[in-house]
């Protein structure tokens, strides 16, 4: 817990008012016992990977996850290719539409990997440019997703 407090304090020190008090834990995983501690240490949001069970895992904390990871971790640990990444995105959107997952949770796309390649970057740029004009698509900023002002 001390590292979480230090991390948020350091972000505030460096980024000031631009800091969004949302924890994205290493490897997008967190021990359930830590979750109730987060609001007391200044965190207003949590983002992990996969479908959330609830939007409020503890009082004072909003959880909004990512659902599409374009990196193939099981095989070559690199960009899985546009086809497979789009299949994952479409699968999540289908699950939302069919009510298999929380339809109120925005679809999250992981883009923070240290092993990012030009091919992955080009995919993200193309995805953004081709979807941003579609009437059913709205790209959101983290502060808007978590209802925080920056």
Residue ranges and their predicted role:
Residues 1, 21, 77-80, 112-117:
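The substrate-binding groove and active-site-proximal loops of carbohydrate-active enzymes
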Residues 1-11:
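An active-site-proximal "capping" alpha-helix that borders the catalytic cofactor pocket
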Residues 4-5, 82-94, 121-130:
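Well-ordered, non-membrane alpha-helical segments in soluble/globular domains
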Residues 7, 23, 109:
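Divalent metal-coordination and catalytic microenvironments
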Residues 13-21:
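Short, surface-exposed connector motifs at secondary-structure boundaries
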Residues 21-103:
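Active-site-adjacent pocket scaffolds in enzyme catalytic domains
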Residues 45-46, 50, 101-150:
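C-terminal domain-boundary segment and adjacent tail
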């Amino acid at each position: 817990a001390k590292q979480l407090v230090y991390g948020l304090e350091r972000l505030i020190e460096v980024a000031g008012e631009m800091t969004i008090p949302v924890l994205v834990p290493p490897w997008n995983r967190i021990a359930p016992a830590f979750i109730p501690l987060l609001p007391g240490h200044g965190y207003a949001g949590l983002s992990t990977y996969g479908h959330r069970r609830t939007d409020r895992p503890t009082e004072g904390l909003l959880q909004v996850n990512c659902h599409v990871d374009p990196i193939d971790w099981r095989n070559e640990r690199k960009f899985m290719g546009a086809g497979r990444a789009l299949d994952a995105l479409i699968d999540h959107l289908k699950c939302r539409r069919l009510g298999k997952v929380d339809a109120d949770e925005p679809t999250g796309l992981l883009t923070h990997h240290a092993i990012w390649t030009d091919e992955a970057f080009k995919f993200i740029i193309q995805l953004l440019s081709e979807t941003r004009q579609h009437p059913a698509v709205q790209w959101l900023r983290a502060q808007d997703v978590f209802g925080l002002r920056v």
